[in-house]
Amino acid sequence: MFSIFKKKKIVPHIKLSGVLGNVGKFKQGIDFSGQEELIKKAFSIKKAIAVAISINSPGGSPVQSHLIHDYIRQLAKKNKKKVIVFAEDVAASGGYLISCAGDEIYANSSSIIGSIGAVSYTHLTLPTNREV
């Protein structure tokens, strides 16, 4: 039977753009507490067949990256939703980790896709001029 009232396929979209973590005076980075409610809302839409996530991040805080990644996977499993990730200009380090929460990842051939990196700090003591 023909019907003009077809079921619409709904795919909520989440846009994550910026450095991961509380960055700068006005905390303009991407952090879990700032995204938690938005992510939860996207996955709670019952008619949604999937959740789309656009990521544009060079990385940043590994803790925030893991929190966001794990929360996306947890809600995807709980709500039985597919996650489709679109890497925009850059998805590197922690941005790439969040991308790995997707069941599918799409990127432009010009996008910068990086590895999940590591940052290490060291203390270096240099001799003073008198000791040289």
Language model segments and positions:
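STAS-typified acidic loop motif
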Residues: 7-33
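Terminal peptide-recognition signature
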Residues: 14, 53, 99
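A short, well-ordered alpha-helical element
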Residues: 25-49
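Short, glycine-/small-residue-enriched flexible loop/hinge segments at domain edges that mediate gating
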Residues: 46-62, 84-88
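Glycine-rich beta-to-alpha active-site loop
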Residues: 59, 75-121
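Short, electropositive alpha-helical surface patch
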Residues: 65-75
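Conserved small/polar residues in nucleotide/adenosyl-binding loops
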Residues: 122-128
